[in-house]
């Protein structure tokens, strides 16, 4: 378990050091968004990797393989649409994220059942959970 915690801490440190990858020349025109596109230009300093240019997304920026894709709490993130899907979750290694398309009534049911089963719901705040449980 200590190895897992070490990797989670390493993942957090790597995330903090990871630069914000932005599209080449994103600041020159408002029509060009900031979302990442790989530079392909023949004379592109960014593509070549000149030190005074912005960072290019490469394999070296990836986090540790064992904890890649996990929630910062260390639990696996499972998307839930209804109570039936919630029952299939293992609370020791998985947590629930309620889908955006779920309405308030079903959301309340899911939160109540999750509390009963001891499952953590990632996208509902503690304050909202208490409010839902009191209904």
From Swiss-Prot:
The organism sits in which domain of life? Archaea
A single Gene Ontology CC annotation of this entry is:
cytosolic large ribosomal subunit
InterPro entries, alphabetized: Ribosomal_eL32, Ribosomal_eL32_arc, Ribosomal_eL32_CS, Ribosomal_eL32_sf
Is-annotated flag, keyword Ribosomal protein?
yes
Q: Which GO terms describe its molecular function?
A: structural constituent of ribosome
Swiss-Prot/TrEMBL keywords: Ribonucleoprotein, Ribosomal protein
Cited CDD domains: Ribosomal_L32_L32e
The residues forming the signal peptide are: none
Name which cysteines form disulfide bonds: none
Which Gene Ontology biological process is one annotated for this entry?
A: translation
Record-stated family:
Belongs to the eukaryotic ribosomal protein eL32 family.
Q: What is this protein called?
A: Large ribosomal subunit protein eL32
């Amino acid at each position: 378990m200590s190895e897992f915690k070490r990797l989670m801490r390493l993942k957090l440190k790597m995330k903090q050091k990871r630069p914000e990858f932005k599209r080449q020349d994103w600041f020159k025109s408002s029509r060009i968004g900031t979302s990442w596109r790989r530079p392909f230009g023949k004379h592109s300093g960014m593509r070549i990797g000149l030190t005074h240019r912005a960072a290019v997304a490469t394999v070296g920026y990836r986090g540790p393989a064992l904890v890649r894709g996990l929630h910062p709490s260390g639990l696996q993130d499972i998307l839930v649409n209804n109570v039936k899907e919630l029952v299939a979750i293992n609370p020791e290694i998985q947590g629930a994220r309620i889908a955006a398309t779920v309405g308030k009534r079903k959301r309340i049911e899911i939160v109540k059942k999750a509390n009963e089963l001891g499952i953590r719901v990632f996208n509902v705040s503690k304050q909202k959970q208490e409010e839902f449980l009191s209904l």
